[in-house]
Amino acid sequence: MKKRALVSVSDKTGVVEFVKGLLEQGIEVISTGGTKKLLEENGLQVIGISEVTGFPEIMDGRVKTLHPNIHGGLLAVRDNETHVAQMNELGMEPIDFVVVNLYPFKETIAKPDVTFADAIENIDIGGPTMIRSAAKNHKFVSVIVDPVDYDVVLAELKENGEVAEETKRKLAAKVFRHTAAYDALISNYLTEQMGEESPETLTVTFEKKQDLRYGENPHQKATFYKAPFAATSSVAYAEQLHGKELSYNNINDADAALSIVKEFTEPAVVAVKHMNPCGVGVGTDIHEAYTRAYEADPVSIFGGIIAANREIDKATAEKLHEIFLEIIIAPSFSKEALEVLQSKKNLRLLTVNIEKATSASKKLTSVQGGLLVQEEDTLSLDESTISIPTKREPSEQEWKDLKLAWKVVKHVKSNAIVLAKDDMTIGVGAGQMNRVGSAKIAITQAGEKAQGSALASDAFFPMPDTVEEAAKAGITAIIQPGGSIRDEDSIKVADTYGIAMVFTGVRHFKH
């Protein structure tokens, strides 16, 4: 008995050549709708689906393969005598190959003007049913959902006259990944349409972007996956112009740097090490901003990641070229800047659209045995809701420094303290188990520059000791959430030393 293949694809990449290869192997091809038309236009002889089902395609193609003659041919266990007898009795023929990919639901809902009706119409029913049937019976049926696998299948057919059992299993596994991802997209779309924020089950799907050399450490394996609708202003959508392949740590650090630089509308440069900012500078142009970011911590920036929110020009590139850096991220690089920076063969240069998120996306954090889901912390300082509990209010320059420090401190590992002065950070205290410890680190780093600077804290002061340390260092303004039962103690110390203090009412823990 001749082997049969059923071919019905939305993505027609390579399908003509593949079907030609099947026909050359003596395999009959059944096809539907647009796929059948394309194959026939290319001179290939195929059988219409209606000839197999004895039933016309109806309801604008919604019902064409949902028929016992199709699914009996797919699901029949060929070495089961009862199955074979029933097939013979009902005049069914086995189907040995299924070549199907699904309606473009993802592409449809990605359109800015998509309607709900359009989205629903692009939910495939017959396709998933066929490929799931075929994948379940993969011992006897080869099922191909990805054009990438066409050459593998044809090569095995030409060499061995059949597809290897291991290949069939791999193809079947791909089918169930494919349908799971497809259903997750549909589930998430409908859930969002209904405004459900915490559904009883969470379905997520990610697409493989690249294998990584290793993970956080050389003994850990790692892979980079991107969300199907990831923001274009993300590392997942960055274009690499030059340099070595990105590592696991590179991607983490680049993501952190991007998150910080998006906080600024004026020209800004951020330097990051181990996902914490070591220097942030703003200026009238990107060269001035970089100079300040570098001067913020010229030691820690070595081997760091740089993110800028303006094009890198030649003058800035020449300064960047002077030190060892892992990555430079910017919206663009001038031709002259590229010529300067590409002389370092390992330096990774990335371009990405840099724009602050207008709405909070979901942040997923894995824990042992589960997953935490929360909104990203995209909240900006709202000056209409702040309060100033101290006798003195910040000066204009202090306000400027406070705002810069507050934008940065939300991106520093808690407990976090950031000092800023004259359009740059001058001290960063990160990840300490007590707040005053982080303050001491930031103050020590700032040295004499701490005099007249502004301090930001990601959470309230449980005791007045941090304010006391700030006063000793000559810090003149503080911004913090407030809300401690001992706020009055901190306010009293601030007033004693003439420090202006701002309460935001918003905490920015980061773990």
From Swiss-Prot:
InterPro entries in UniProt: AICAR_Tfase_dup_dom_sf, Cytidine_deaminase-like, MGS-like_dom, MGS-like_dom_sf, PurH-like
Any GO molecular function: phosphoribosylaminoimidazolecarboxamide formyltransferase activity
All residue ranges annotated as the MGS-like domain in the record: 1-145
GO cellular component: cytosol
SMART domains the UniProt entry points to: AICARFT_IMPCHas, MGS
Any coiled-coil regions, as ranges: none
CDD domains per record: IMPCH
Catalytic activity from the UniProt record: (6R)-10-formyltetrahydrofolate + 5-amino-1-(5-phospho-beta-D-ribosyl)imidazole-4-carboxamide = 5-formamido-1-(5-phospho-D-ribosyl)imidazole-4-carboxamide + (6S)-5,6,7,8-tetrahydrofolate; IMP + H2O = 5-formamido-1-(5-phospho-D-ribosyl)imidazole-4-carboxamide
Superkingdom to which the source organism belongs: Bacteria
EC number(s) given by UniProt: 2.1.2.3, 3.5.4.10
Keywords, alphabetical: Hydrolase, Multifunctional enzyme, Purine biosynthesis, Transferase
Pfam family name, one: MGS
Gene3D superfamilies per record: 3.40.140.20, Methylglyoxal synthase-like domain (3.40.50.1380)
UniProt entry tagged with the keyword DNA repair: no
GO biological process per UniProt: 'de novo' IMP biosynthetic process
Pathway where it operates: Purine metabolism; IMP biosynthesis via de novo pathway; 5-formamido-1-(5-phospho-D-ribosyl)imidazole-4-carboxamide from 5-amino-1-(5-phospho-D-ribosyl)imidazole-4-carboxamide (10-formyl THF route): step 1/1; Purine metabolism; IMP biosynthesis via de novo pathway; IMP from 5-formamido-1-(5-phospho-D-ribosyl)imidazole-4-carboxamide: step 1/1
Similarity comment: family membership: Belongs to the PurH family.
Domain topic, free-text comment: The IMP cyclohydrolase activity resides in the N-terminal region.
Listed HAMAP family: PurH
NCBIfam families per UniProt: PRK00881.1, purH
Protein name: Bifunctional purine biosynthesis protein PurH
Species for this entry: Bacillus anthracis
Gene this chain is encoded by: purH
